[in-house]
Amino acid sequence: VFGLIRSTLGAFYVGATWFSAEDAKATMGKLPAIKPTMLVLVPGLCEILAGLAKMYGPQFFGGELKTIISGAANVPPRLMKVFEAMGVRLLAGYGMTETANLTTGNADTDTHPDSVGKVYPEQEIKFVDDEIWIRGDNVFSGYYGDPEETAKTLTPDGWVRSGDLGRMDEDGFGYITGRIKNLMILPNGENLSPEEIEGPFYKSPTVRDCLVSESEIDGEPVLAIEILPNMPAFEGKSWDEVTAHFEQLVKDINATLPSTHRIRKVSVRKEDFKRSGAMKVLRNQN
């Protein structure tokens, strides 16, 4: 739905030339010939594109690219900086299939690097126990043939329960802080989103991806983190130096966190995480 509405129908609406990428990775090699002015990508493909652009230079885009619109997962701030250095704006948004694409988005002239942007016209957002609820004419009418699941997701007065946790700042910018299904219950009874702890790590240019989870040390429940390095940042470094860097990074971030939120176990991955077709890390399969 994200690709159909934001890319395909959006291009038709403004009368733009549209290129369909049936094989996204193969299409990247054709960018110099296509010369796009805008790309609509999930963050995982943004990561790949950034790596290729670093290898071949900004001309890899074809010389005309001005904007990348990304959704479906949080966009690491370091990726935004990579593209900004090449003169390309990476704009993040938020939405879901049930709301027919994006509900919030950053604009060229009104953006915040850690945010999914402001609410689009004709839509409403409210927070119920920190869960994001969405209402508008774009909201679906229900799951076909599944009234039970529809009743769980869609309220009688038209609000979609997103299952996502978030907040909005005083300027109207929205932030995604986690998923209800990912909540961990700490020994003190507190609910904690792993995404809340992962966020500071994603601000480091050395972290490509990470996962926080519950673990144990000698039978004691602790928080653990797995980190996938952004290896181009460690060119010429040994693996011991890479792991030492992340041990120090964990110490530095732990110093900013409440004691109950601190990471006690660290592992650094040489292999990628298992991912979905949209390049999202599969949290419960790694």
Segments and roles (model prediction):
Residues 95-99, 162, 187, 276-278:
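Ser/Thr-glycine-rich phosphate-binding loops at phosphate-binding pockets of nucleotides
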Residues 1:
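Conserved AMP-binding
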Residues 12-14, 19-129, 218-220, 231, ...:
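Conserved adenylate-forming
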Residues 39-42, 125, 172, 201, ...:
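Residue-level signal for inorganic ion chemistry
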Residues 165, 204-230:
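C-terminal boundary motif of the adenylate-forming
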Residues 119-122, 126, 131-186, 191:
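Conserved ATP-binding/catalytic segment of the ANL
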Residues 139, 173-202, 231-241, 257-263, ...:
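Adenylate-forming
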Residues 184, 209-214, 249-286:
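Conserved C-terminal "lid"/linker of ANL adenylate-forming enzymes
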